[in-house]
A protein has these predicted regions:
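Transmembrane-helix motifs of polytopic, lipid-linked glycan transferases
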Residues: 161, 291-314
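Membrane-interface alpha helices of multi-pass inner-membrane proteins
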Residues: 330, 366-382, 387-393
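Transmembrane-helix signature of polytopic, membrane-embedded enzymes
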Residues: 284-287, 306-327
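Membrane-lumen/periplasm interface segments of multi-pass, membrane-embedded glycan/lipid transferases
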Residues: 250, 426-479
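Interfacial juxtamembrane loops and adjacent helix segments
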Residues: 210-291
Length: 479
């Protein structure tokens, strides 16, 4: 244990060295400074294309980034022509483009060169909105890069020095890799929602994270839900966006009443709900609370898949590969119900395969856990309900008697009917009442109208369906 402790300490400081020194070597080895030029004191020229160009003369020092400081009610687009010295001391020119969000009031452009001069071009209407431009050289700490380096070094050390243990317990290998990769993904995403319909899933999880029947929406929450959060191109901009979100979270723009009951279709958000609720209860910043919501989802889904690998007697490597697929880890690290569904179905199917292939009689505990995992996993994705029918394939020699077999399969049939009824009956009720129910993720789809059309024009619908299937199965359309 002492050796492992010393190794962890060494790897920690080595990771800091790599992130702060090696990955930012040019910034580290050159002088640290910050020099400001007021735009009003700089020579400018207007051209016939309706643009204004500012000329900035510099002294050839290394510049890591250039900051634009402005006050505007609209985004500002700019072009930069940077004259710099290459490794041979010769002058070269590179052109950069930037779009600055009016919400931040400043923008950062990565340069990474020894700058001789700069030509900054903006539209005439934006010229009077620029206040100053700042040439800087400094290192910027990145949690994502640090954690990536730390995880690679630490996991490599552990897997090599404790290969016997991880060879016998592959589930722990999976758990450590999944949590490490998922956390890096969460930190790399910064403040953007990159998964499919993630802003809608976040809205549902945030709403349900309020325990009582009262909830508040801050400006930061509404900005995420309405996709109004600025996007950053540099680490500095991402830090500024985080500060802006934390400040915007102090402004409440909407408060309303909500139901206390969590619908069964939304129970897949429980890990995210717990993370968001805990962060708000502890008084964490908005950015940290959102991170906690994603992180709890990652922990829960990783724990479920870890259990699937642990208790499965067959296909452990296959489960590990599926659990570490890029899309799987990405979903585990996002606001979505798909991660919850995938993890529980993996557990349910893994236990079913173990039960099916084992030579012993059916194990009640293992079977019940498998069925429960499938049922809960299908709450938000009814399309996976037929997976329960797999238990009809259970061989007769798995049961102690014919009566036990019949009761078991009858119970599975009843469970299937109940699961199908849980979403079919409400849909039929909406059709008979004329209520319009669509996809809660948005769009113009209407489940009610679609089902009404099918029931009202069965022959026409059958023709459309067959034509669509024929087109899909046509050899010319298959890639």
């Amino acid at each position: 244990y002492l050796r492992d402790f010393i190794a962890i300490i060494v790897i920690f400081f080595l990771s800091l060295f790599v992130e702060q020194v090696l990955l930012q070597w040019n910034s580290f080895k050159n002088e640290k400074y910050e020099q400001t030029f007021q735009v009003s004191e700089v020579q400018k020229a207007e051209n016939k294309d309706g643009e204004t160009t500012y000329d900035f003369l510099f002294d050839g020092r290394y510049v890591s980034s250039i900051y634009l400081i402005y006050q505007s009610k609209t985004d500002i687009s700019s072009r930069m022509k940077v004259t710099f010295y290459d490794g041979y001391g010769q002058k070269e020119v590179m052109e950069l483009e930037d779009t600055a969000s009016f919400l931040l009031g400043k923008s950062a452009v990565w340069v990474d060169q020894k700058v001789d001069s700069l030509k900054l071009t903006v539209e005439n209407k934006d010229a009077d909105k620029l206040n100053s431009i700042i040439f800087v050289n400094h290192t910027v700490f990145s949690w994502a890069k640090f954690l990536l380096v730390f995880s690679v070094l630490l996991l490599s050390y552990l897997f090599v020095s404790h290969c016997t243990f991880f060879g016998k317990r592959p589930e722990w290998m999976y758990a450590m890799v999944s949590v490490a990769l998922g956390t890096v993904i969460i930190l790399s995403a910064h403040h953007s929602f990159d998964s499919w319909d993630e802003q809608i899933h976040y809205n549902i999880a945030y709403t349900d994270s309020w325990v009582w029947n009262y909830m508040e929406y801050s400006d930061a929450v509404m900005s995420n839900v309405e996709m109004r959060v600025p996007t950053g191109d540099t680490l500095e901009e991402e830090q500024w966006i985080g500060e802006w979100l934390n400040q915007a979270n102090d402004t409440v723009v909407l408060s309303s009443q909500k139901g206390r009951f969590l619908r069964y279709g939304q129970r897949a958000y429980l890990p995210q709900i717990l993370g968001l609720g805990l962060g708000r209860t502890l008084g964490l910043s908005y950015v940290a609370t959102v991170f906690l919501g994603k992180f709890f989802n990652l922990l829960f889904c990783t724990a479920v898949v870890t259990c699937a690998i642990r208790f499965s007697k067959y296909g452990k490597r296959t489960l590990m590969c599926v659990g570490l697929l890029p899309t799987t880890v990405f979903l585990f690290s996002s606001f979505t119900y798909d991660a919850f569904v995938i993890a529980l179905l993996m557990l349910g199917i893994a236990l079913f395969v173990t039960e099916y292939l084992s030579e012993e009689k059916i194990q009640t505990k293992r079977t019940m856990v498998s069925i429960l995992a499938m049922v809960v996993g299908c709450f938000s994705k009814a399309v996976y309900i037929p997976f329960l029918a797999l238990y009809w394939l259970m061989p007769k020699d798995k049961f102690y008697s014919r009566r036990q077999k019949n009761l078991f399969k009858a119970g599975i049939f009843v469970l299937l009917i109940l699961m199908f009824a849980s979403f079919i009956l409400p849909l039929i009720g909406n059709v008979t009442s004329g209520a319009e129910v669509g996809d809660y993720r948005g769009g113009d789809t209407s489940q009610t109208s679609q089902l009404s059309m099918i029931l009202g024009y069965p022959l026409t619908y059958t023709g459309v369906l067959l034509k669509s299937l024929g087109t899909t199965l046509d050899r010319k359309s298959v890639v």
